[in-house]
Amino acid sequence: MPVRLAVPEVDSIGPFNRLSASQVNAYTTCPRLWYYEKVRRFKMPQIPVLFVGRAVEEAFCRMLQESPALLVAGAAADTLSNIPLDDSGVPSRDSGATWPADRLLPLPVNQWPSTMDTLRDWAKQRLETHLPLALHAMEIEWEKDERKAGQWSSVDPERCMSMCLNGLEMNLAEGERCLEAKGGPELDAWRLGKRPYWPSPDGRAYEIPLRHPLAQEGAVTLVEAWEIARPWFVDPNAGKFAMNAIHPEHWFQGEYDLVYRWDGRINIVDLKASVGAGDRSGNYVEQLRMYAMLWWVTHNREEQVDALQIWYLGANAIKQIEVPTVAEME
């Protein structure tokens, strides 16, 4: 499971005192700077690039959440935004809650993308809808920050869109693999409406009572492959840090960017809106290795990650990270 919530009865540490991969890397890189930021609470200058990455990731995930069998390319950006949340900001498990995608009727099948090019065109238009809104929201947040530095005019929307499109191509490659694998091992279960305990966010409820509304017959279709290969990610509408994976002893937590699992393997992906040439790039490797450990311990030390990847959206490159051994994780 990509999410493991805290158990309040035994959590003596609390959400603000847990370690994270970024804190570990910050301390390893410069203990003094870590002390100033985490202990003395000094806040470093907040430059626009720190906010741009969040905007790119949000636009990308909102596109992933959507289905070309439900939404036309020009649909409103907030079509799937009104999801029910519990008091902690986690998507609600209330069986009586109303979910936006469950209220939509599928488009006629003859309007579904039938080629990779038409699917790509649809997804690109969805990104063009979501990215400007995400950038605007981040600009407002940056403007309100008392430690803001630099100029928002330094943000290049075209470069941000280029990074989103690079991510799209990487995800389409997963969809193409799913097509070639004839839907993978979960095709029949998906068509029957069976879902993991933490399903990939698609605007639907945790459980589908009957057959999946987009299920077809015979060979897997392109739209089915899009749906099946959709990775898990934090629902863009969930509360901030509401969907962490928390160590059973509550001293460490992490939030995965993408988890691909359609083929029966676990591939954790970290999205980076950069080219990977900075001083911190080495920390990204250790961050993913810590995530592999976190996955292992939150699955009773019985399930290991199969692959770790960093998607450098600025460089249009995928970096494969060696998965740590059990001995290393212990």
Where are these regions (language model features)?
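Short loop/turn segments at secondary-structure transitions that flank enzyme active sites
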Residues: 33, 42, 62, 66, ...
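C-terminal, charged and often intrinsically disordered regions of DNA end-processing helicases
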Residues: 1-49
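Alpha-helical architecture
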Residues: 27-28, 55, 255
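Mg2+/Mn2+-dependent nuclease catalytic core
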Residues: 88, 203, 209-330
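Hydrophobic (often cysteine-bearing) scaffold residues that line and stabilize catalytic clefts
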Residues: 48, 52, 160, 164, ...
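Short, charge- and proline-biased low-complexity linear segments
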Residues: 43-56, 308-314
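A non-catalytic, helix-rich entry segment at domain boundaries
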Residues: 62-235
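Short, hydrophobic/amphipathic alpha-helical patches that form generic packing surfaces
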Residues: 33-38, 54-66, 166, 170, ...
